[in-house]
Amino acid sequence: MKVKKILNRTEYIETEIKRSKRKFDYCKVSYEDVSNFDKLIKLHHKYEEIGPILCLGTRNGREIDLFRNIIFGNPVINTLIKIFEVKRYGSTSLFPFFESFDRSSTNDIRDKSVIGVEINPDAKRTDTHICSFDEMPENWENKFKIIYSNSFDQSQDPEKTAQEWLRIAHPGAIIIIGFSYTAATDTDPVGEIEIDDLKELFGGKIIYYSNLHGFYHNVAIQID
């Protein structure tokens, strides 16, 4: 793992907001991805209730809707979501209305809540808290049983970010991280990430690893 040092915090936040605005309509996560995560979670989670669930770096929020519907939602609605998904600048829906039912609230986080964190103020909605994912609300400590992000490479300081994610994770939580082995840049300061780097940062036990097409990876870590 290599880190491009960005010492100015204000500059870092402004850069990440601009990046989010440019890619706001892009959602890397698909219905199939979250369906696979759902199977993994149900196989390994330690508690009667799976949630609450937290998605980090959510941009337009579609991944929040996918996690909520697939894990906690109506099977009929899920069938419609799957049918109307198209691959267009990532994954999107021809009829996003079907994905918007029963969104959670950041002001009332329950066992079946699915919440997002996004640095871009344009993403504000009832289930999305606007902040950096390495500076989250103090009262979220030990809150979330499932944490998902494909944005770890956007961290300014990977050790600080990992500690913050561990702080808000419930004991025994599953943290799912998508990452690629690309060089560090101004917008993705953490580059050349390897699975051993994440294991060292987060500890716990690796319960899942996938190598997609040789350049993109998903890893699931169950923390102690």
Feature names for model-found ranges:
Residues 52-135:
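Class I SAM-dependent methyltransferase SAM/SAH-binding core
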Residues 1-48:
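Class I SAM-dependent methyltransferase Rossmann-like catalytic core
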Residues 154-165:
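A short, conserved alpha-helix within the catalytic core of class I
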Residues 172-181:
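Conserved beta-strand signature within the Rossmann-like core of class I S-adenosyl-L-methionine
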Residues 131-147:
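A short acidic, Gly/Pro-enriched loop at the edge of an enzyme's catalytic core
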Residues 9, 213-220:
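Short hydrophobic/aromatic beta-strand or adjacent loop that forms the aromatic wall/cage
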Residues 182, 186-213:
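Conserved Class I S-adenosyl-L-methionine
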